[in-house]
Amino acid sequence: MSGLLFVVSAASGTGKTSLVKALLERVTNLHVSVSHTTRGQRPGELDGVHYHFTTKENFLSQVEDNGFIEYAEVFGNYYGTSQATVKQQLAKGHDVLLEIDWQGAQQVRRIFPESKQIFILPPSQFDLRQRLSNRGTDAVDVIEHRLSCAVEDMQQYVNFDYIIINDDFNKALHDLESVITANRLMLAQQVQRHHKLIEQLITPNSE
């Protein structure tokens, strides 16, 4: 049985990470692939839990070996998703969720055209600016640069299968969970999960 591959993307500050974290607490048999990154480890982050932290040299070596399904350079740091890990999880029948940017989503689409891709949008640019400012970790010019990049990123919404507006967190979470549930109820998935039951039901005199 093969699992489903979901991709969740959004511009910086849209609330994607918080939504994914809450989703994992509500949905069973959904695994998030831990990305590899050359970014420095932040306080409270654990290697192998939040990211697989690595050097630029090691990262680029894995790129040459086709070790990543997708990778991208974001604000001077590299991020990538292990191809072997994702394929192993899917082969075991586990559903996998990738929390990556739109560039990575495009790369995933080329390898896994059947992947279900979800894009999160903020309710307004004003709201997005407030979220970026409330982080309290960046200078004003950095915030303006990130907002400009976010506007460009949001133009990629047309390349995704689902759009969720993160205006109300609980509603957005419900919408995200609904996408997972609806895809699990598709014919192909249900036949895989319940093939014995279905065979019994459609076989005459099989009570």
UniProtKB/Swiss-Prot annotation:
InterPro entries membership: GK/Ca_channel_bsu (IPR008145), Guanylate_kin-like_dom (IPR008144), Guanylate_kinase (IPR017665), Guanylate_kinase_CS (IPR020590), P-loop_NTPase (IPR027417)
Pfam family, one: Guanylate_kin
One Gene Ontology CC term in the entry: cytosol
EC number: 2.7.4.8
Domain (Guanylate kinase-like): residue spans on this chain: 3-181
Location relative to the cell: Cytoplasm
Top EC class for this record: transferase
Predominant localisation class: cytoplasm
Cross-referenced PANTHER family: GUANYLATE KINASE (PTHR23117:SF13), GUANYLATE KINASE-RELATED (PTHR23117)
Family of this protein: Belongs to the guanylate kinase family.
The protein's name: Guanylate kinase
Organism of this sequence: Acinetobacter baylyi (strain ATCC 33305 / BD413 / ADP1)
